[in-house]
Curated annotation (Swiss-Prot):
This is Ribosome-releasing factor 2, mitochondrial. It comes from Kluyveromyces lactis (strain ATCC 8585 / CBS 2359 / DSM 70799 / NBRC 1267 / NRRL Y-1140 / WM37) (Yeast). GO terms for cellular component: mitochondrion. CDD domains: EF-G, EFG_III, EFG_mtEFG_C, mtEFG2_II_like. InterPro entries: EFG2, EFG_II, EFG_III, EFG_III/V, EFG_V, EFG_V-like, EFTu-like_2, G_TR_CS.
Amino acid sequence: MQHTMSFRIFLRRYATKHDLSKVRNIGIIAHIDAGKTTTTERMLYYSGKINRIGDVDQGDTITDYLPQERSRGITIQSAAISFNWKKDYKINLIDTPGHADFTFEVIRSLKVLDSCVTILDSVAGVEAQTEKVWKQSSGLPKICFLNKMDRVGAGFSRTVKELVVKMNTRALLINTPIFQVDPVTNESKFSGVLDLIYGKQLIWDTNDPDKINVTDVDENHDCYEYLVRGREALVETLGETDESIVEHFFNDADGEYLNVSPEVLNASIRKATISLSATPVLCGASFRNIGVQPLLDAIANYLPSPSEARPPELNHKNVPITQNPLTGLVLNKNPNLCVALAFKVITDAIRGTMIFIRVYSGVLRSNHTVYNTTTGTKFKIGKLVRMHANVPEEVNELYPGDIGVLTGSNVSEHIRTGDTIVTHVTKKDGLRSFDKNVELTLKINPIEIPPPVFNAAIEPKTLGNKKPMEQALSQLTREDPSLVVTHDEETGQTLLSGMGELHLDIARDRLLNELNAQVDVERVIVSYKETLNHSTQEKTLETDDGYKITAVIEPLDEEMKAKAKKDEEWFSLANDNNFMIMEKHTKYDPDKNWPFQVPYVAVVNALLPSSLVALQRGGKIGGFPLSSCVIRIKNDWDLPIDAPSISPLLTLSRQLFTQILLGEDQSNYSVLEPVMNVDVTVQQQDMGPVIQDLSSARKANILSIEDENTNTVSESNIRFQHIADKMWLPEDPTLEFAKLGKEGQAPKMVKAQAPLKEMVAYNNKIRSITQGRGSFNMYYHGMQPVTHDRLQSVLADYHQ
């Protein structure tokens, strides 16, 4: 009774402070240069968060605050900022990088977001990186904003069709572009939007960012026909998945599309968006301040609150998850359980280590004791902070759905990216009241880290610079786990691995100029791995005093995780697609009859670093770290009941894993190399030389050749091609022949897959072959075995 009453009191206090239904956690995602940061800057301005609009080219935007971001004009790390819209709504926004080298920043941001705004360049259409981040954000409701509608060659209708076919989604047109004839040049210029929901024409004054001329669109208006046809298309599309709007159309709107009320439309659009049935589409030109306010309205109207968003994936599949519209998620039927995920670490010059977290359930309060379920340690946190880009704001508590920051002297040593923490909602140290077998082992599934594809050797200038170098590298990898530091025992070299040349260039810049490391960074080379062709022999090691462990190391089959058995637990080993499996013990169950003095989580935490170190030691062909391997701990391991420490088990496991790998013949190893998806855009006259170069010099596999503006239709998206063909869409007056070659032919898109080694410096080659007319995008596809005819070349190039 006391438990129920205290929760009711908490609910009343909570409801008065925090209306969860008005919270939106969104990410801005797109291809590089689509206008993410420019759009974010306008959102902050129109919300009243800032009183002056910054410019990416001038290096003075709010969310791009790092020196490297401002000097290069690109987003390098995700930035979080909160602002209010129309007083009622609180928007927590994360602006993510668009460059493929910083894909991990996107991945870890998407992990803690409820929805996305996808920015599309209306000139370029749906680009390669856009397709990639769309897939990465699968399962998150989205809004699309077609930006740069003021540019020559912008194609609203073409881009919408690409969106439908390439992303396999229905498009709901919320507004469409309006073009007006410039009296001086006699050209059509993008000047505003036609609001299909409220039947309004919105024209922006480009000389005054705060001025919009709003006109009702009646039967005498030039846009009336577009309004009628747009409304008809919107209602018909919604009616395909929402029977209630069909009933309203016939019963309350008398079969007239314009009689369907905005309230009914908005409710139906919201339902379709959250259920992933369709994607609202708006347009604008952020640099010219056009269309941003309607986008903010759409975020508030159509995207989910934390209580409506998808719940996190947990390691315990049977833990009940309920949604409370006031308090958000309740896990394990315990309203006093606060669960949060650490998704980012930065080091602040004044505040020290700052841990970015997303609160999923309960309320997190400053100075409370928390428990890290990933490491099995408890500690006290300090003050809580909300970040506004690089400006902190201290708060006493963080609510469900909030994105905030942990500070304090303890956080740096106790939390890393991907860790789950739990705490009691009301008690400063209420951990003892939690179920130790469920709530104190509850983990949100970790953030997946993509494998690095480039290496650079780093050496201290003098022996005295070695320790500062190691400390600087430790800080870099703590903040960005997609950077990996390894030590080559044969050469004595320290290797820094990353997602691309730009990624490593930024890391080098930080090492030298921000962290003042006295180091020499050698040339950047491709990162290779080795893997096992088949499973090793099973091997057992045991000691006289009762420690025993049996293991086998297996190549990772893509279907292994999908077919994982109930009596085995999987643990990820950093970012080389390696895993450790703990088979359920034949005698001991951590949840029921655990007899040992040390907890089960301590046993696991001893075996994880042993597994990681063993696989990092490398294979027998080139000494490259092992990738796509599984260390399976068999179900008969043992240790003394009264053992006070797991150190002997740590030592024994390292010896065992090393012996297993050393015992394998070289023939059981293969070298893997990163293979990239390559999209090359060329004019017709350049096709022959480009394909010849790709096929021969680049060792590429040509997948397809198509017109750049033509959607390739596979069996999986024929239905969406049909939907796109039937859609009503307005004309594209800015298109004309802007994207055609000099002979009037559309550019071609060559899609291929090629080894990364052969694509290094391809930018210079494509410019030379096409005399500057060609361009390309490249992004990671996966690791594949090096062909026999190229193996010696790869080894010689790497070890030179």
